[in-house]
């Protein structure tokens, strides 16, 4: 019996992933959720800084994912995300610079809106660095 379902991950810049998979684990705004074939229909927001884990042919692959929505249907899953990167695509120097900029903005203690934006930027930078560090030499 086939235990796969179709997954499509889209960003504004590219089709990040498309194919049949056995399972995914996605970081949503309420925590991580695992999806298998025949999951109940669901629409949920994606965390601003999280991971997408894809199981295909018994092997797991992990990616950085940021913001957007996931729609689970009977015929598959579609993820619309602001950004998605494989670990080898993450520019560590750029992520480190983004982390430092966000930390500086947090120290400046500006408006609440600027603080929230800086905090989100810091979370994204830290998650990108965490994922990259698992697969790249830092």
Curated annotation (Swiss-Prot):
GO molecular function, one term: proton-transporting ATP synthase activity, rotational mechanism
Claim: Cell membrane is one of the keywords in the record: yes
GO cellular component, one term: plasma membrane
Keyword Cell membrane (UniProt): yes
InterPro entries linked to this entry: ATP_F1_dsu/esu_C_sf, ATP_synth_F1_dsu/esu, ATP_synth_F1_dsu/esu_N, ATP_synth_F1_esu_C, ATPsynth_dsu/esu_N
Transmembrane stretches, start-end: none
Membrane topology: Peripheral membrane protein
Keywords annotated in UniProt: ATP synthesis, Cell membrane, CF(1), Hydrogen ion transport, Ion transport, Membrane, Transport
Subcellular locations according to the entry: Cell membrane
Family recorded in the similarity comment: Belongs to the ATPase epsilon chain family.
Subunit structure: F-type ATPases have 2 components, CF(1) - the catalytic core - and CF(0) - the membrane proton channel. CF(1) has five subunits: alpha(3), beta(3), gamma(1), delta(1), epsilon(1). CF(0) has three main subunits: a, b and c.
Function: Produces ATP from ADP in the presence of a proton gradient across the membrane.
Stated name of the protein: ATP synthase epsilon chain
Source organism of this protein record: Caldanaerobacter subterraneus subsp. tengcongensis (strain DSM 15242 / JCM 11007 / NBRC 100824 / MB4) (Thermoanaerobacter tengcongensis)
Gene name tied to this protein: atpC
């Amino acid at each position: 019996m086939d235990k796969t379902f179709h997954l499509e991950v889209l960003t504004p810049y590219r089709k990040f992933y498309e194919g049949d998979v056995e399972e995914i684990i996605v970081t949503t705004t309420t925590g991580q959720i695992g999806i298998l074939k025949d999951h109940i229909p669901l629409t949920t927001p994606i965390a601003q800084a999280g991971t997408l884990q894809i199981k295909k042919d018994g092997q797991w692959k992990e990616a950085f994912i940021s913001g957007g929505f996931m729609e689970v249907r009977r015929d598959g899953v579609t993820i619309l995300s602001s950004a998605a990167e494989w670990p080898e695509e993450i520019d560590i120097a750029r992520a480190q610079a983004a982390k430092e900029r966000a930390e500086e903005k947090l120290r400046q203690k500006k408006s609440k809106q600027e603080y929230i934006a800086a905090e989100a930027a810091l979370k994204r930078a830290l998650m990108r660095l965490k994922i990259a560090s698992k697969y790249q030499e830092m």
